[in-house]
């Protein structure tokens, strides 16, 4: 049944994940300046309305930095998990840069090392060490 559903929809992957932000420029400074992402798109599509996408270098999935709809929260647990080559090294770098990170990298049996961090709006993101 799963194969039939995939064939019926034409879905081929994840293109963009949206994160609620209160200030585009501050968010760009964090994601590009601190995390080292590249800015892929920054356009004004209506007066006072911007569409901004950032991504890790070489990634196919982007992150849309978008204002939260009225009444929707900012500072949420996004569930977004980024891959990293070294959770320990990135944890130390981000902590030294003043980023709100967990006190320690998690090391659970059978699970890749990981930790969470918060962006300037309080959105929780995760960095998970990849073996590939």
Language model features with spans:
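Short hydrophobic/aromatic beta-strand micro-patches
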Residues: 18-20, 55, 81-85, 128
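Short, charged/polar surface micro-motifs in flexible loops or helix N-caps
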Residues: 57-62, 71-73, 87-89
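Short hydrophobic/aromatic beta-strand element in the GNAT-like acyltransferase core
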Residues: 51, 81, 114-116
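Short amphipathic alpha-helices within nucleic acid-binding modules
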Residues: 30, 88-93
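Exposed loop/turn and edge beta-strand positions of beta-sandwich/beta-sheet ligand-binding modules
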Residues: 48, 76, 111
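Vicinal oxygen chelate
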Residues: 1-10, 16-19, 42-43, 91-132
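Eukaryotic phosphotyrosine signaling hubs
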Residues: 14-16, 75-80
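Core segments of cupin and vicinal oxygen chelate
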Residues: 9-12, 18-61
